[in-house]
């Protein structure tokens, strides 16, 4: 049977589901808090004016592209630390965590310089008002200063979650969300003696929140008794380039996968633009809701990475294979709920974004397509995270590149323009590309996990 799902009893299945839920739920809530921070930025910038909102939209797109790509690179720490934890290598867990912080700091500084360098070309490329371009530049400058803290935070995030302590990540994320509200209010509108920075104030608030999050996680880990045996904060460790090389080897393909997926969805918006504003608005509704729902398989997948890595560290290879299957089944059950939610409640969901009749009509149909691709999207996401637990990241990268850019964009363009399917041609191609990615990744996971079990039985 696929991934040996019939190997263990139903009680073992329920136990694994409970363990996955205990890890996934706090991670999901932490992501909700992070999305809430972006929502507050949008509301506050919109309150300052449409030009400020436009500046934040442009600046945040640049920041998000760098942040998401680098976040993928830092995700290499999850399987590394989880496997060491499962193997009982306490000292190596702490040392790998320290090297992760160093790596994150260097990567963040590189990201900061990259964003600085991008400001002038962005301004030269855009043909907007001086105010929008200037506010965007200020926003990018402030958020660039957040990059070192953001990557250190991701290192600590990976450390805590890989040691089965996602609750503290959730608490820090909600504290950051709460802090972001008054900071935005103060910096955007100029309260308590501060100058009114408009949309740029959102960038300053983002910088402050990321530095707070990194510092809060560090203090929490330093004070919490559970973490003391690992010694992350007990001593100072010099950068180890051998560990850096390992992080890069595992993480670079993950980062590129994130970039390929995010850029493909972003590029489709530009290809839809000739159909008119109503179609672009409807597309944004579909992508926004799909992005929110995508947090669910991401959380299940992250929990699966930790559980699989831990089991591999304990040399429980059959268990790791079984957990891969349980993760997928859990995702499929949740996907059914999301499909029904999108199909049955698509009208009220769309009306939350826009009340224009033309947009409502198009977006309601778009959500039907979005509902259809949920099972495939959940599957490909969780399967790629499971493979990450085995430290297999290059193959998923190639699969994502072929699926999203080869099977998604080009066929989508042909269906939209040559076969007159319009916006729905792109969504049809997305469903096909996600299905292809899901099948390929599950098959890869089946072969990888089976070979791991077989090779260690032969020893």
UniProtKB/Swiss-Prot annotation:
GO terms for cellular component: plasma membrane. The chain crosses the membrane at residues 20-40, 53-73, 100-120, 132-152, 168-188, 202-222, 252-272, 285-305, 325-345, 358-378, 395-415, 423-443. It comes from the Bacteria. CDD domains: MATE_NorM_like. One of its GO terms (biological process) is monoatomic ion transport. InterPro entries: MATE_fam (IPR002528), MATE_MdtK (IPR050222), MdtK-like (IPR048279). One of its GO terms (molecular function) is xenobiotic transmembrane transporter activity. It is found in: Cell inner membrane. Keywords: Antiport, Cell inner membrane, Cell membrane, Ion transport, Membrane, Transmembrane, Transmembrane helix, Transport. It is a multi-pass membrane protein. Belongs to the multi antimicrobial extrusion (MATE) (TC 2.A.66.1) family. NCBIfam families: matE, MATE_multi_NorM. This is Probable multidrug resistance protein NorM. It comes from Neisseria meningitidis serogroup A / serotype 4A (strain DSM 15465 / Z2491).
């Amino acid at each position: 049977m696929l991934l040996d799902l019939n190997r263990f009893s139903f009680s073992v299945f329920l136990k694994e589901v409970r363990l996955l839920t205990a890890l996934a739920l706090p991670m999901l809530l932490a992501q909700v808090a992070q999305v809430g921070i972006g929502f507050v930025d949008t509301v506050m910038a919109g309150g300052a004016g449409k030009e400020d909102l436009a500046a934040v939209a442009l600046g945040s797109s640049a920041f998000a592209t760098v942040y998401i790509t680098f976040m993928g690179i830092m995700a290499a720490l999850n399987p590394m630390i989880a496997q060491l934890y499962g193997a009982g290598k306490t000292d190596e867990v702490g040392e790998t965590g320290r090297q992760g912080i160093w790596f994150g700091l260097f990567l963040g500084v590189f990201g900061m310089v990259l964003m600085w360098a991008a400001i002038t070309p962005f301004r030269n490329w855009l043909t907007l008002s001086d105010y929008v371009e200037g506010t965007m530049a200020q926003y990018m400058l402030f958020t660039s200063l957040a990059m070192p803290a953001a990557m250190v935070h991701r290192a600590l995030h990976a450390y805590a979650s890989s040691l089965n302590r996602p609750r503290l990540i959730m608490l820090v994320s909600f504290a950051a969300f709460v802090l972001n509200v008054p900071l935005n209010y103060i910096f955007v509108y100029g309260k308590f003696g501060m100058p009114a920075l408009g949309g740029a104030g959102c960038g300053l608030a983002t910088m402050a929140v990321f530095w707070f999050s990194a510092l809060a996680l560090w203090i929490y880990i330093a004070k919490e008794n559970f973490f003391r045996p690992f010694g992350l904060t007990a001593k100072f460790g010099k950068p180890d380039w051998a560990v850096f090389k390992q992080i890069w080897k595992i993480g670079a393909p993950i980062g590129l996968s994130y970039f390929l997926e995010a850029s493909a969805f972003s590029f489709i918006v530009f290809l839809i633009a000739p159909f008119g504003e109503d179609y672009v608005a409807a597309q944004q509704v579909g992508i926004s809701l799909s992005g929110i729902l995508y947090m669910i398989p991401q959380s299940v997948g992250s929990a699966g990475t930790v559980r699989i890595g831990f089991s591999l560290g304990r040399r429980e290879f059959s268990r790791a294979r079984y957990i891969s299957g349980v993760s997928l089944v859990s995702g499929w059950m949740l996907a059914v709920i999301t499909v029904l939610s999108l199909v049955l409640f698509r009208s009220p969901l769309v009306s939350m974004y826009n009340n224009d009749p033309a947009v409502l009509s198009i977006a309601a149909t778009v959500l039907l397509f979005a509902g259809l691709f949920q099972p495939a999207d959940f599957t490909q996401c969780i399967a790629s995270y499971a493979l990450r637990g085995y430290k297999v990241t290059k193959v998923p990268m190639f699969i994502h590149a072929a699926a999203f850019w080869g099977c998604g964009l080009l066929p989508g363009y042909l269906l939209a323009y040559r076969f007159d399917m319009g916006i729905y041609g792109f969504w049809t191609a997305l469903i096909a590309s996600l299905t292809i990615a899901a099948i390929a990744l599950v098959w890869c996971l089946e072969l990888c996990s089976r070979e791991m079990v077989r090779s260690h039985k032969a020893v």
